[in-house]
């Protein structure tokens, strides 16, 4: 299993930090009006409708269209990262500014915040997953890839270094 050390200086934000607020975290949760737990495989960042959404990593656009599973207008960027294939996913966009096959650099404009798909208001749903052919995708907490945001709830967050495990 590889352990990656990410320095705070390497973080980028898909939405400017002074604009976005994390409203839902990675992990198990109970949705309003429901009784069963569901896994939330990303983070939700509330932001004004139309705010720019930017890539956090360089890579190739492998999906830029409407997602039929609830993500609305969505962009996937596939990158090589620490010997793994990593996908960063940006969902519920109001507009997509890239096309499938394009190569993007970190901080490239991908689209704008929206409320498309299964959404309760303008926000960005941001996911990270490791592609594992024949084994299924492995979702990772995307907070290790972004700079700090304001939060609805105080949770521990490491400012100077973050460790994540990628692999089995």
Model-predicted segments: where are they?
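Positively charged n-region of N-terminal signal peptides that target proteins for export
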Residues: 1-3
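Short glycine/proline-centered loop/turn elements that form peptide/ligand docking sites
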Residues: 97-98, 109, 115-122
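Zn2+-dependent peptidoglycan hydrolase active-site motif and core
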Residues: 38-40, 55-97, 122-130
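Surface-exposed, glycine-biased beta-strand/turn segments
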Residues: 6-73, 106, 115, 119, ...
